[in-house]
Amino acid sequence: MKTDTAYYVFDLGRVRERIAYLRQLLGTEVSLAYAVKANTFIIEGMIPYVQRLEVCSPGEAAICERLGVPPEKMVISGVYKTPSFIERSVISAPGRIYTVESLTQFDLLRGSCPKSTPSTDSNPVRALQKADCTT
């Protein structure tokens, strides 16, 4: 096939083989995550094979939401977390997992937690809110 436009071909079968290989080496106690920024076009193909999708920007989160990725399957990571993005994420999906890159991000996350929700260890956001990082 001749074309004037560059294109990429991804073999999801090979990707699944690689995931199976990693699973064999690491066992089931290790969770695997797919970094959405690597290639947003294969997200749907990755969902059944990894435990989490690492999302590092509001744009990546929007893509995952449009594709119907369950919020509990996303890890909100990276340094680019605006206050409005964190607040919207916490309100729309209180069970999401977050990485915190700084005390500023921790304070933003803790400040976005609903005050009326009972604390439980099963809700990572609430567990973070219980931590005392002021001393």
Question: PLM features: residue spans?
Answer:
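A charged N-terminal "starter" segment
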Residues: M1-S116
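Short, structured patches in soluble enzyme cores that scaffold and shape functional sites
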Residues: S102, S122-P124
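Active-site loop/helix belt of alpha/beta enzymes
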Residues: S112-K115, P124-T135
